């Protein structure tokens, strides 16, 4: 092994960048200093004496070291670079074909005949097979044609050469079968792009050359004579390396920060700016002069790149450099091209590529050579070199997001004059690595470029401003608090004033009046018969998932993904595409199988005839494959870009499509990869084959054609399958986008919930399953004839869109920043929208039941028929592999064909192998793996800190596992409750981790060891608690099974009821209700008491209220919305409660118009919920004790004959024989859990006093009196409250005293030095009008419930005075404990 390492260490670094023949040939040029054994020279009889063996001329010959041949260096193939090389051997001794880098082409070429005729005429050339080869260490300028016979001679000594030739021929066959024109050597590969360095060899200059479209790791040394035609590039190299290049005549008297406005396009720009672009340049210059960091947010296609280049060029004129531009990898070449067009005088370096390529850039493009010079000596003879900052060679560095993170150690030390971030909305997440890295870079000025600064909410816009100016926009929480009510005109104006200096936003319709219009048409298409068949089959096979109550959202997501695939094309499903050898028949089936493709075919044929060019966007790479098959059969020239195409290749394909007289008819693109920062204005038709969930992605795609440079009207066609999830998706996404820009203050990024998923999936299903005679199935079929297609494609009918989706954006927040007024929805409309949202949430609990019944009615018969057919097929042994798997059986069905493009762009496909592809963005759930078949096993532990994983489970996933285990137990070890909660994990992974976890908790407990026996840390896990909970839930599961298997038997035997008398039936609550309660624990999980209470299907709310002799209350949707907005402080007087019959239902706010009535309803509703939860919790705890005791009897084999040895006698003094008539004694432990009163001492008063105001002392005295009353009446008050009994006379008297003290405090606080007596009377509450009743229902004890001694009507007046004192009650943290009154 060591010898292998040593051999690898001494290998040459000059490896082929790529091999056309995919060879792994590792032969390299021998080192120059290699010594050869001295052997006797071979005497060749045909050697020419003192002459070149090739041309016959003498002088400057190179002699072979092993034979008598001699050659000129230029006559050799390949030419010899160094004629002075020692130990050189001629091609006859050593085959030069060992130095082949690539085989590029092969053809029959003429060569001179070896047979000389008798006449003096020129010998007749003969055609022989020759190969075009590129040599190692030489550029494409020095490629040579080598006859096949030379290869045949070399096969003897180089057996691998034969394999390389065979591989080349196989690849040539594939090229010949394609429609693309084959080019062996592209002209760009022999065109000098940049010269990096210079050296002198044997009196001749040589230059290190980078060629166009080749990366920096393919640079070659060329003699000056070989590149003599590229004098401009040679001169540019000399200028760049000249230290006087930047010595411009700058007016040093003028402060460079003084704003200088440009009235017309400046001379240093090699083009003409539009008026709005000139305005943008002035805005950027002004912002730079004021040191104000800004966002240039012009609409896509208005030339933000050009305006930015104009700014950097203006700064370059004043010797202000260097600048950093960060952009998506796919747009870097476009940036480079725009710099070359508009500001060719600037030295722009593009920094990206492999590690080797970046090393070349850093070595030759970053810094000038050191210029040693003497400085004023602080010490004798001290010499210093220029700082690296002063030696920076480039003016602008273009780089990608990945390089910012990957090479921050190189880029961060540089002090940048200006930093520009293209597609700046990527910085909306402050937790992203890009945001964190860029904040550490030093720059004098920062600019963000984005066409969509407000995609989701104001919080994201704030994060962009925080990146620009962390001082002015420091705290998101403060920003949210300051602008929480953004609909108020005053706040809108203030926000506008704050942001206006930082944001400029223009749209096409305002600044480009002469731009051709665009029109979007939504074309509704019917599914084909095959699509309908598979669409219905997906529903039928997943009947059990659809009817499952509370089914996992991941399952619905996967069903939706399968349906989306069917809408695109049924061939998207695995195994559906038939194998047809006849190409015409295969094409016919391809069209007939898909309604969309049939319409697309009709449109494309006419678009081709009319000379239009088309962009087709889709979400799926598989769909791109099908569209590619379609175009290939039609023999149409096309280009394709998806997430697998790298940055350089993308630009090549874009250039081919945009080239003058290009024969490319259409461009196939994935929406995410082909919708960002590229210019395809030569196309005038856009077809959105299937829509993106994010409408902004489709807007980006449309803007590729409708932008600067477009000369034709642009038609956009969006294909939607009628009555399918596509139609519903489009409706929801458009509605959400409109709402986003109407109610800016309410914007929050929300993932689609389960109700919306079911609504989307359900859409159109009834019509799909309806027969032709049913009413639901009578809607007419959509048919597009030739006349309809002609009308759709008639551009003379096109007018500019009145209100498109992107125009709606401008009706919202961003419209303010083109110097106009804000437009917002009014408060009433906002409140109505919020009420609709609350009402929708209130129906969510019933949604599962409605969903189940809907699908059961629609699919039950069909599912049963489907099962019968499968069983029948199985019985006949004809059952084939299912083409459509059930989502229930395979929770990952259909996710493998999703487009692999990233959420923002294709950046995962970096050209650097070291730069790993980024994960899935922001807003989209990562797709789960199907398993680890044929892969290496997951390591037990890996990573450190936050990245620490156990069997691939991170910290969050491990916590979710434990939480789920404590809630549902291990069940039957099928982990059914775990799979939907660990969406990133497969069942196999969960099962593997679960087995490991159970092994861990089964180990002998060692409290002194922080790890388990295998080294996995315990992470604070309380093993005893986990074991007890698992055992309890097993008992619950067994009890549920016992109840189901023995419906006539009691839940517990009589001896258990005698042991726990509280289990006996009450006046309302019976044994069957305990059965419901036990099942509810398994359904909702242990400890989820509120979920059990809220479960409408259980129907226990009214039962518990009747058992507790407490009225059942229901609230309206508006009141529930108000309830959620409460801070929990109460605000109503319980004494105002009216008499109700036990068990009656109170409907809140039915006839009440006053605010107090609504507050009362909310208070009683909250109190009812608290009591319900407390009852459920106590009841489950009692059932738990009974099950534990029953199991203990079985364990000890006592059978109820005697008491359990380890069990203390059960003492239940707090629970009577019946549920509803229990009496709870108040002990000292219960009182100790109440909040403590803390009287104010005289020393504290003196220490805090700031003046001699006697009123302050009086308030402290009143406060101490209140504390005394609370302490004296604590026990009696709590006793009355917890047992729902009327308070004693003493408590009522103390209550009236407390009321009097409160009035005195309010009187003191309402008096100020500058208030008149009349104003004092207005602001003081009229306490004499408060009627205090002494009934049990109307009065609560001092330490029970919520008591507010202020009168509702007087609260506003009191608040307007100097202050107020409210006496409130806080709920105890533990629900089983009573409540205490707290004085604020």
From Swiss-Prot:
Positions of the UniProt region annotated as Disordered: 893-941, 1122-1152, 1313-1344, 1365-1384
CDD domains: CD1_tandem, CD2_tandem, SF2_C_SNF
Subcellular location field: Nucleus
A GO CC term assigned to this protein in UniProt: nucleus
Induction profile: Not up-regulated by cytokinins.
Biased composition (Basic and acidic residues): 1316-1341, 1367-1384
Phosphoserine modifications at: 23
Extent of motif DEAH box: 422-425
Record-listed ATP binding positions: 298-305
Protein family according to the UniProt entry: Belongs to the SNF2/RAD54 helicase family.
Name of the featured protein: CHD3-type chromatin-remodeling factor PICKLE
Organism: Arabidopsis thaliana (Mouse-ear cress)
